[in-house]
Amino acid sequence: MKKLLIPLIAAFAANTVSAAAPQQVIDISTDKVSMVLTAAPGGEVYFRHFGGRIDDPAPLADYKSNRRSDHGTEDLAYPATGGRNFREPALRVTHADGDMNTELRYVSHASKQLSDKNVTETVVKMTDCCQALDVELVFTAYARENVITTHAVIRNREKGPVTLHSFYSSSLPLKADKYLLTHLYGAWAREAQVDHTLLTHGSKSIESTREVRTTHTENPAFLLTLNSDSFSETCGEVIAGALAWSGNFRLNFEVDEFDVLTVLAGANPNASEYRLRPGETFTTPEMIYTHSFCGAGGASRNLHDWARNYGVYHGHEAVPTLLNSWEGAYFKFDAKVLKQMIDDAASMGLEMFVLDDGWFGNKYPRNNSNAGLGDWQVNAAKLPEGIDHIASYAHSKGLKFGIWIEPEMVNPKSELAEKHPDWIVRPPKREAPTTRNQWLLDLTNPKVQDFVF
């Protein structure tokens, strides 16, 4: 009996030590900002902190939340449908065998400094506890700019295809007494209207379902002022986020019964199911975060610095001042009118002239918005000597020359639409939807890609 008790006691002690073992700390930091995750002994990966820099995040290994797992409100780093998660998930899939549950468990993490010593990349690897589905959370920290970007990589190792229903780029839990959400909305001729909303319990979404573009109706970016119901450019704690994605997007803000705010950010799940074949990976868009104790101005300056250094092509080059032909001439111009505009631009010390809409189309001249779009030949009636003549004239006056195109769109009244009706995006057995007298070209068609690019 004593021989039997010894291994039983040893096994019980081992299990007790394992259950009480501290969580692994995953520290992602810049000069002034820290994002801290922990991996629990059971494999769950939690978000523990995003805000001001923590020089020693080790104590977070012993963090104990008052939020209970049986309430489905734990601060999982990438919550999925299934298990005890009852909130909107960052990941919702149907596995190859029809199973709709996913419970991600920690595998490993690693950080490395990139060739640019200012940039550190951290990859957290997780896998489903029962299915051959892997998720990597990739965090890139920009030290001087105090910006951290993140995206997810989903890999299918199952025997059949997996259907992705929701695949957000990021899930970010925050704890504060108050949350003031600031974002931009608008419409034509009144873009970038500022909206301030004090978040209460429940969910609020900022989203677009306008397909291939972000819009002036809603922007995929936000500011969150913490612990205050007043907005300030100069003081207060502020988190800023922006999604690097030009299609349908969704930013969801959910305040639960414990006053914890979870921000889900990424591609809009609406009509976005993706079939991931065995062996394939899917990479979500990048989500960009920063934090400031100096109000919205501090957060926006962090993003400005990051954009100039990393986010914008030739970000440190001076942008030329320019005159665009649109507001001055609309569709009604010829070479004489354009030359006069170039002369005026040069006399004012401007640096570039841009020829806007109306320069193309012959069978269907682009004299209004109803015709010619897609027929990218120079309109011989307006510009008999061609665009080269206008560009050379601009150069002779010391100006750069630019030109406007909208290659993804086509007018129904155009040679392109007549010759290639199969290039138009249209639902089966239905007419192609028309917006602003335009149809959309199918950019997934290789022939369209060759034409456009």
What kind of feature is each model-predicted range?
Residues 142, 286-320, 327:
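Terminal connector regions
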Residues 4-13:
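Sec-dependent N-terminal signal peptides
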